[in-house]
Amino acid sequence: MGSGPIDPKELLKGLDSFLNRDGEVKSVDGISKIFSLMKEARKMVSRCTYLNILLQTRSPEILVKFIDVGGYKLLNNWLTYSKTTNNIPLLQQILLTLQHLPLTVDHLKQNNTAKLVKQLSKSSEDEELRKLASVLVSDWMAVIRSQSSTQPAEKDKKKRKDEGKSRTTLPERPLTEVKAETRAEEAPEKKREKPKSLRTTAPSHAKFRSTGLELETPSLVPVKKNASTVVVSDKYNLKPIPLKRQSNVAAPGDATPPAEKKYKPLNTTPNATKEIKVKIIPPQPMEGLGFLDALNSAPVPGIKIKKKKKVLSPTAAKPSPFEGKTSTEPSTAKPSSPEPAPPSEAMDADRPGTPVPPVEVPELMDTASLEPGALDAKPVESPGDPNQLTRKGRKRKSVTWPEEGKLREYFYFELDETERVNVNKIKDFGEAAKREILSDRHAFETARRLSHDNMEEKVPWVCPRPLVLPSPLVTPGSNSQERYIQAEREKGILQELFLNKESPHEPDPEPYEPIPPKLIPLDEECSMDETPYVETLEPGGSGGSPDGAGGSKLPPVLANLMGSMGAGKGPQGPGGGGINVQEILTSIMGSPNSHPSEELLKQPDYSDKIKQMLVPHGLLGPGPIANGFPPGGPGGPKGMQHFPPGPGGPMPGPHGGPGGPVGPRLLGPPPPPRGGDPFWDGPGDPMRGGPMRGGPGPGPGPYHRGRGGRGGNEPPPPPPPFRGARGGRSGGGPPNGRGGPGGGMVGGGGHRPHEGPGGGMGNSSGHRPHEGPGGGMGSGHRPHEGPGGSMGGGGGHRPHEGPGGGISGGSGHRPHEGPGGGMGAGGGHRPHEGPGGSMGGSGGHRPHEGPGHGGPHGHRPHDVPGHRGHDHRGPPPHEHRGHDGPGHGGGGHRGHDGGHSHGGDMSNRPVCRHFMMKGNCRYENNCAFYHPGVNGPPLP
């Protein structure tokens, strides 16, 4: 119309000649003119006006004329446009108009209007539009169902007329037509239900074969040759085969009941088109269970293979009811070839296939895929000449060859000579050299410019033109509600402060004092004299360095030694004066600047020199080789306990025997199995001899483990009662460490026990006990002895003995014993001996026994050091009773096993890697590995 706005009243005035008072179109000619005006309408007002005119028109002739002229296609265009632009009011008006028009199935096939309406009914956003589209779809479905029931009868009549012309040439034709007509008129519902029951009751191959034979037993009687084909065709519900067989059977005789039964599957399709679901749903059970049923029934595939030629045509014609006309055409071509009669029979086969297009229409409507071209062409082809069908079928199956001139094709392309040339190959060396010189110069300039970073302006700055922008049409945020929400929110919260500057300059410099970096020397020699290192000997006071000025750093070995000595009290010499540790260290180290500490440690005899100098001062006790004790032996540094504690709780002392671990269990730890553990019962030490199993010697002291006399497997006996008379039992004293008359006790390291008269005490190194008459003392010291007393000789010393006394001889010595006396075991042990007592022989020694002394029961010690004494099987372990008279032979103790003690000779063990790498070990004397020069001879 015009480009300006349209007034609907003016438009209606122009159309007044074609409309009556109610707005309805008067005549058929008027609707064609209105349609021509509708094609030119572009505005929504004019289109809605024309749609309302159509809604007011009631005459079906006028509406049909509008559809025939092309109004339905025009409405399709308007519907597509409004759907793409999502114009809801126009869509509603178009749907109302479509609902008002008398559309048929043929009209619906012309375009995709039905598809668009179906999509609107499912995916439209507007609820009213969705409801309107669904109502329109349901109305169209009702139209499709009603027309699908009426079309088969009309098309059958047309076919009968066409076939009636050829009745003269085909005498068999009237018989089949009469039978088909009578069957269609008698019972259409029965014919529709029977094939349905066949499909539903026999989903599997095996079942279907049995039921098919039961239902069609009379039909098998006249045709025995084709029994197998009958089963296959019935099973798949194939129509052309029964038709062909019926034509052969019906020629000799009239209509027989078997012939009628064979025809029943033929005409089920035209009658079944009234119910769409019956056609579409039944094949699903066959498809779903076909695989399992094929496994259950093996003979069916064999039948197919044998009768392949006969079964081929029905299988090709089988999908015709479901797929449409295209699949039936090749099947009809085969029966027409052998005889002149089959072309007419092919038309009979097409008769049930003609109503297929109406059946497909509702299916396409349901899936919103209505195609106008394919559905419209199929009903046109169905009444056509069968020769055209066969001709089309042959064209589809024919193989065409190209002409002679087109058999060969030539393709020409231009060859690029430089296509396969190696571009990396240097052709001209002079040019390559120039390029390399230029690249080097460029790289040099770039590096120089980047190093100095002198950037200069090469292009003068030109101020750009100011742009004059038009004022914005809409002020940003004019209708924003968020700014009010944020303003309300900021009223009740703290303001957010951002302290960073607005300018991108450098930040304010922070004041700080520059501190020179600390120089960490890589070589230790450089730092020897710069930073003095003070070695702290004791927590209370600091000991000076060896040179008096604190200039040198102690080696790790000496540092550990000084720390271990500083843990206990300061050692005292025999005269009671203190030992000057600084003098010892100065003599060991020599001048601090002469040799670095690392070089001193590398000397093989360095540790031996330290020991030789420290042993006479009493810092390390007896030497490791002199009496079999390790450095820091009984009462050594820190007085460490080197045996597993007993059940009653340990009380560390130099001897765990008499008066040793005091508690409820006074007898030390339980003995291990005879096999011995590798830690506490190691191999025999050649330097110290085998384990001693002697008489009533000392209990297990440091580095000793008491052993039982009965093989070591028996549990320890209950602690015996305390006896004070005549020395009591050598295994006990009172729990508080006080000895009775004649009793004795071995005091722990750092303890000073109170002793009664006649008692004896084995004292730890560095202590001087007060002894009463008859008292005795541990190794390494010369105690003051009363009459009848005895003393424990130090390593390499011969103690002075009183009458009736006994000594504990040092290692390698044969002590002289008085009459009735007893001798303590070697190695710094002092057994408690009363008059008439006995002795526990030292490991590997054969003691000299005086009169009245009884040797160990069953023990024959060896004279040569390094041998292991035999096991002593005497009274129970840790138990020997002191007798009053002489001649007592005690037993039941197992002495010190050689080669397994901590701090002893560990040369047969692996070397401690901590000691070798760092020069010291955190376990010190308790380490179970070999420290060369400390717990064994130095490495060669």
Swiss-Prot record:
One of its GO terms (cellular component) is nucleus. Residues 147-210, 248-270, 304-400, 533-580, 617-905 are annotated as: Disordered. The modification Phosphothreonine is found at residue 256. One of its GO terms (biological process) is negative regulation of mitotic DNA damage checkpoint. Gene3D superfamilies: Conserved domain common to transcription factors TFIIS, elongin A, CRSP70. Residues 357-433 are annotated as: Necessary for interaction with PPP1CA. Residues 1-348 are annotated as: Interaction with TOX4. Transmembrane segments: none annotated. A zinc finger (C3H1-type) spans 906-934. A motif (PP1-binding motif) lies at residues 394-423. The keyword Nucleus applies. Residues 540-551, 565-579, 725-763, 786-844 have a biased composition (Gly residues). The TFIIS N-terminal domain specifically recognizes disordered sequences in protein substrates that are then dephosphorylated by PPP1CA (or PPP1CB or PPP1CC). This is Serine/threonine-protein phosphatase 1 regulatory subunit 10. It comes from Homo sapiens (Human).
